[in-house]
Amino acid sequence: MKVHRRNKLADVFFRASKDALDNITSAFDFVHPLNVSLRYTRSVIAEALADNPDLTTADFQRMIDPNNIVHGVNYNRAFIDTAWISQEESLAWLLLNNLFAIHEGWAQRLFEDIFSGFHYTDRFIKNLEFPGLTNKFLSYYVTNGKKSVALDGAFWGVYKAKSHLDFSKLENYMLCYRYFKEARNCYMHHNFVASQKLIDAYNDYIPVATTTDLDVSEVPEIAPPVLGQPVQLRLRDVIGFSQLVRRIIIISDINLLCTTAAEKEFFDRTPSNWTCRTLSGNPSRAKGQINRYSEKLDFLNLNGRRIIRICSLITVFSLYS
């Protein structure tokens, strides 16, 4: 399984995106050790029972938690009566619910901290949760009146190249997102039972549920849902899905940096103790000034001709370095 790493802020433009990616990493820092601990405890109890079938919950407690630190653990029910496949599925639901909480919190934070002050409505949040997102970047988020020519020209290509992602697959990722989101809704609101919305999302997702269309080595999926029957979930598939959530956040972040609202993010990160200087009229020196500004604030470096695109924006606000 892929190891999640902490993200440098320069990997994405917005602080909210960086924090969301780090929160996904933190979720795995909890789930993976918990997975190992559960498997280990089961193996210890299974070996002990093989030697003595008459052991009780009290005996297991003395083996696993001799200092009785955790109260109320029913070892028989948790590690004998409950099959591992059921316990692992509970982990999968826990992780899935966390992934959507992270994504929804990311969208909410972007809206409240940055975009709500630039004539966006609550649609800003909802659009980030549904297929059709690629078109929404053109028709809603980055329209002519909301586009920053300076940030688009200076940063979009740099961040896109650094991401190594295929932006044309975003719609496929969103179909997968909606499929797992409806599964999560069944978990939260329908007692794990499959809804018609889940079946519809499944039918929309299946045509693109291939390694090629998702650019993955293994397709995240759920057993075909049956209306009114419990939804079956595997931890391995949720782990795979988490990679697509990361891609959705990164691709969305890079598209949203092209907005005039993103200029607020760009300048809000200026330290209060920096000295204000006028941008040099010498192109070479101006490039160095802007690159230092970008580095200090943990944005990706600009290169070559792109430096000219942001000069007018920097000049308006002066330059902090």
Predicted regions and their residues:
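Short non-catalytic regulatory patches outside canonical folded cores
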Residues: 108-174, 189
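Extended intrinsically disordered or low-complexity regions, especially N/C-terminal cytosolic tails and loops
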Residues: 1-127, 205-321
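Short flexible/disordered coil segments
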Residues: 138-143, 180-195, 254-271
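Short, glycine/acidic-rich beta->alpha junctions
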Residues: 87, 91-94, 168-171, 179
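Histidine-centered, metal-coordinating catalytic motifs and their short helical/loop contexts
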Residues: 172-209
